[in-house]
């Protein structure tokens, strides 16, 4: 089905206010959920909203909490999210990293005791729109087996890198082949995954999203490489924030909350002039996209460039929402 941005935001706002969230916070949170969905990231927008409300009702998310600065070391700051609303706090932390970068050339904010930030790419994009390189990542509850194991002991720990090119170039990737959100999107659409995304119950690689969602044997990105990246991203976030690791979140908490996150902004213009920056970035993009195609009907894509098109299409034609997901939200 199709809905407008206004309908989507109003639905989110209604549910948030009905759960006791104050009107200003509810409006800002609903806006971010709706913007994420409008951008085409359904898995971490509208599809994720019922799960967000469940955690709000369970007390994992404290809606009136505000992040608190703990330590300041020039370009590096350490903050405590105090289990505040994840997407609103993440936006504030990237804003703070940008402020630090404006003063020092680079800014790093390490955040502990945080909640799920929903679409991580929003915060990289936020920096790139202002001309900064944006880098951020988060740890999570253990939802992926390390390479060679059956049990979930590492997080998908998504990493975002956004570059202020025209259009913005951005990688937004979990350390698994697919996020659990994308498994859900494909399952709801009745699609197999385009490549193997995990193991079935017999230990064979599979493209069936529903099987992987159920048994939790999701495949690390690049096999052992994604497994290793997940581990070191967790270690860095834990140390810099003095926060909880994947092991602590999984073993000590009843659900995924109290996680650790990193936000980095780099002011490119302190290192290179604007015209030179733009020319260098354009040459890189042209060089890549001019390569001979393996399939003449399939263009060579650059990461993040599709979001401008998706946003325009959704504004023109309405936002696609799965019927079952919309029914869940209406019932909240």
UniProtKB/Swiss-Prot annotation:
It is found in: Cytoplasm. GO terms for molecular function: 3-dehydro-L-gulonate 2-dehydrogenase activity; NAD+ binding. One of its GO terms (cellular component) is cytoplasm. Pfam families: Ldh_2. The keyword Oxidoreductase applies. The active site is at residue 44. Keywords: Cytoplasm, NAD, Oxidoreductase. It catalyses: 3-dehydro-L-gulonate + NAD(+) = 2,3-dioxo-L-gulonate + NADH + H(+); 3-dehydro-L-gulonate + NADP(+) = 2,3-dioxo-L-gulonate + NADPH + H(+). Its EC number is 1.1.1.130. NAD(+) binds at residues 168-174, 224-225, 304-306. The keyword Oxidoreductase applies. InterPro entries: Diketo_gul_Rdtase, Mal/L-sulf/L-lact_DH-like_ah, Mal/L-sulf/L-lact_DH-like_NADP, Mal/L-sulfo/L-lacto_DH-like_sf, Malate/L-lactate_DH-like. Belongs to the LDH2/MDH2 oxidoreductase family. DlgD subfamily. Homodimer. Catalyzes the reduction of 2,3-diketo-L-gulonate in the presence of NADH, to form 3-keto-L-gulonate. This is 2,3-diketo-L-gulonate reductase. The gene is dlgD.
